Each structure stands twice: as C-alpha cells, then as structure tokens.
Amino acid sequence: MIPMEPTPSEPTGLDFAGTCDLAIWCKLLHDKGWSGPRIARAIAKSEGYVNNLIRVVERASPSIMLRWRAEQSGLVDHVCATDWLVAVCLLPHDRQDEELQRRIAARPGYRV
C-alpha cells in the first residue's frame, strides 16, 4: 500500500505560538468551510473549545485581540485567560475594553 501524502487542505505539523494564534487558525479554517468537529479532530482539541476560540475571534474588540496577541510574545503580563475571554466577548466592544483595563489594573505590579 502506498502511504498517503498530506493534502494542502489538511494542516499538518503546525506549531502555534499560543492560544491566540490557535484561535485565529480555527477561525480561518471555519471561514474556509471546515466544521467545528473537523477542526477539533485536526488539532486534537474538543469541539467546544474550538467553537469558543472561534467565538472569541469573531466577537473580541480590537483592543482585546491586540492584548491577547501581545501576551504570546511575553511583552505584557497575561490577563487574557481563555475562560475570561469567552465571558467578556459577550459584551459590547466598549465594555470589553473597560473590563480589560480593569483586569490589567487589578494585577499586582502590572505592566501595560
């Protein structure tokens, strides 16, 4: 039997810099027509987790997305926990930004 070569439509061996990158990839694949279960199988995560990441990317304010992305590089302290993002992204963008500032200010010795 001849081994199958991976097709360009299947992401293989991708390394993600962090959860934000993973979420953006999930959203991209979803926009390309992949179902939640298919994405979940491809990245070995639960369908619920994948759907939550997609929802965060769809609903997060630009400030939240920029902060979340910056946290992956280690330039700022981590405040964008996934469970917090899922909850806060149900709010309007101005409220999301207020909650982000409140969360940053609540950290002891925080770096903006």
Annotate each predicted stretch with a short phrase.
Residues 2-24:
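Short, Lys/Arg-enriched anionic-surface-contact patches
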